[in-house]
């Protein structure tokens, strides 16, 4: 099986090691850019464990694993089924459909194995030290194996995954290159996938260029939406520059999903979920942990109404909602470092295909 390994590797090295990425997290500098309605902060440092330093070989391997259905019981489902670049590194569904699903990735997919939550985007997970809506994983390496073992997702035990990969000579070579002297292990599967996920960065959105002095990077309408976003206190949870935070908040009516409480057993966490990033949010709907908001307008209006009901803000008019949405759509969209979809994978299996394309 042939695939553009060199092209993939080159693209990923640029994504992981460019000066743009390396310049983040180096400490605060005096802000002298155009007006912004909050205190300026630089990007934080990438969270990278000492035992898994990022390399181009790991990222290249992780990308192939991410798109290869070899890591699923049905040999048709991949990580990219629920985290596709077409759908903002999510899947366009309210809740995901894992193994035994039929149809394209995204709307139109059907199947018996529904997850209980909306697929969170993997944009900028490199900056997180807790993963999933409930924060149950303390590292990307721990997170990477959970879908593998979950019956409604990939449903493949780690030992079977190792054996399947070991039967493909190209994967043997790729693991030897990425992990010399170690080979194919469960831990190295997780490390390769984590390295790939750390390369999926949004750090060059129009908002970023605006703060660097390009006043024309965002429109006047987007600037008005940015001010409304700040006036409503939205930045208190969706804090720039990542437009997210490590907070867990209960904003929606609590159903059967108790959220963070299941992890901490603390009643104060009842119905609380981690604040998601708003970068590339244009493409990652439906929204909220349960996918109950079909579009951004609904999500923004719902959040504003909740804030108003709690005395933390006010409801927004339709025109104001539209301006906030323009800010989110136009100022925070940045796909320059999304993973390159390979043309084929070493297993020879069919990469999950998207039957629908969202507007670019």
Feature roles, as predicted:
Residues 8-12:
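Hydrophobic helical h-region of N-terminal Sec-dependent signal peptides
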Residues 14-16:
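C-terminal motif of bacterial Sec signal peptides marking the signal peptidase cleavage site
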Residues 5, 18-360:
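Periplasmic c-type cytochrome electron-transfer domains
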Residues 1-7:
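Bacterial N-terminal signal peptides that target proteins for export
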